[in-house]
Amino acid sequence: MDKRVIRTKRTIKETLVKLLQKTQFEHITVKTICDEACTSRITFYNYYSDKYALVEEMFEDYMNEALADYYALQKENNKEKDDIKGYNNMLTAIINLVTNNRDFFEHTGTASNPYLYSGFYNYIYNCVMTYINHHHDNVKPKYPINQIVTLMCNGLWGIIAESFSANTDFAELKKNIFGLYNDILRSGLFERTQPNLVG
């Protein structure tokens, strides 16, 4: 991709994040984005059909960032492809993504920006669903996978949102999430073919 295109698209995305600090997504217009970014609407529409297409690409960027982090973690500390370590690496990648891009994600709550919440939730949901479907040799959900994934994703997002509100320290946030989710993996919600894997 042309460097000028990359630079322009990055500016547009950064501008939307900046606008979210003071304005709900539903009240942000393409004109507002362009005015703030010093970009013409013609340029904007060269790349995006509307602001929703812009956000969709941002979600894809974020998910690619998280997946790259996940695969790097797997290569670094889970060459044996242990299911539990894989779950933890997936959680780490999601937490890293959200904390590294806090200016965006702290404005994706159900109350402030429901469209952004539902959009990104669907990406996370599909990611976790795919993981569980492909990595449940040793840890198998006892109940329907879609219900387990809904519980895990809503819970994770709720904890992160609450942590943002309370300005929870990153290390403490990570510790609490890992403790909670490893307890869930030990619980009766999952059937373990090798009981000692979680520890």
Task: Give residue spans per PLM region.
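C-terminal peripheral helix-coil segments that are non-catalytic and often amphipathic
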Residues: 133, 154, 162-199
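Short, basic, alpha-helical segments at the C-terminal edge of helix-turn-helix-like DNA-binding modules
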Residues: 29-30, 58-71
